[in-house]
Swiss-Prot record:
Lineage, broadest ranks: Archaea, Methanobacteriati, Methanobacteriota, Thermococci, Thermococcales
Any one of the GO BP annotations: gluconeogenesis
Statement: the UniProt record of this protein carries the keyword Electron transport: no
Name this protein carries in UniProt: Cyclic 2,3-diphosphoglycerate synthetase
EC code(s) of this entry: 6.5.1.9
GO CC annotation: cytoplasm
GO molecular function, one term: ATP binding
Family per record: Belongs to the cyclic 2,3-diphosphoglycerate synthetase family.
Amino acid sequence: MRVVLIDGEHYPDVTKWAIHKLGDVCCAVFLGGTEKIGSLKALEDKIGVPLYHSPNYLDALKRAVLENDVEEVVDLSDEPVLTYEDRFRIASLCMLLGVTYRGADFTFTPKPLKKTKKPSISIIGTGKRVGKTAVSGFVARTLKEVARPVVVTMGRGGPEEPELIEGEKIELTPQFLLKVAKEGKHAASDHFEDALTSRVTTIGCRRCGGGMAGFPFFDVVDKGVELAESLPHDLIILEGSGATFPAYRTDAYILIIGGRQKTDFLRGYFGPFRIALADLIIVTMSDEINPEKRAEIRKIVEEINPKADLHFTAFRPRPLGNISGKKLGLVMTSQSALPKAKEHLEGLGAEVVATSGNLSNRPKLREDLEKFRGIDAVAVELKAAAVDVVTKWALERGIEVIYLDNEPVNIDGKDLRKSVLELGKRVLGRRA
């Protein structure tokens, strides 16, 4: 069955004609506009199907879809009643409800969302470089207090077949990771990073392409989930890639928003879809934005999903080795993050004597490394070229490699660790 979106800028006879040509229409949603209609009751009588309306057209559309056996929403409206922004809001709601949204020259079709056999949590993002893997590692090691999690990742450099890393059992040394890189694998993939930083079992999967709503074009996550369900672990964490995430209806969703992202990407496009999914929302790098932008992000979230638990956080580097008394070369993906990271590491007893923010730019990174002098160790995030360039460079020169985790720390007075534990307990309790 179909629901149609209509407005008062079309004559009722024209709307009735279009509904008849479409066929299989169960109801209509009135979006606004009064130029060519009388009362809504008269419009309903004219078009011959039940008419839903509300001051908020999204509320009316949601009721229409939930109260009827709707598979498709067909847009028979137009400007000025509907703007491009409105249409993306409608598309986001349709993705959330699992129905197709079709207009004269566009179609948005949701992927069928599968269910995991075991309790599960999705960690998704609003884009790349928002700190999703760092947060995923934090979530995984936090949930070890109440569960035995396994993390299933998807990435553009992931393996063709799911790759199991038993992070609970093996130690991921720089030498081991370099050996993996020399075998032609992406040793800084998310499943290696999660296993290294959190000592949990991980499963790495490949994906290619990402749609506007966040679904991958190709991936092998189904095989990864099947492997995860065969293990003795009792909680599956599905980690997205960039703005793309596995097509699973998990028991809970954690959304990562980068504080430096444009707010247009949150209130527009498919930002509302991701926000509406979330039980817990973590804004990272909040210390790099002003209070006005934090307030704007809060307002957007509260308008779309007021029930979500919202946290504003900053990243603090957590060295996975002893740095006290050592002269460090510091290598990160973000140039802007270097000053605070340097200050934090020096507060732990190190002396940072050289830095590079070009971890994701191999040619510039190699130039930076050649300028490093007088260091005992190199501290590097496990991302991008951390293994095949930085680790290789350091080990060839007898320089110690210390990998860095980025740990989210609240700057809003809330307790993210407590919220993650509560969410994990709720998810486990639902399947008990």
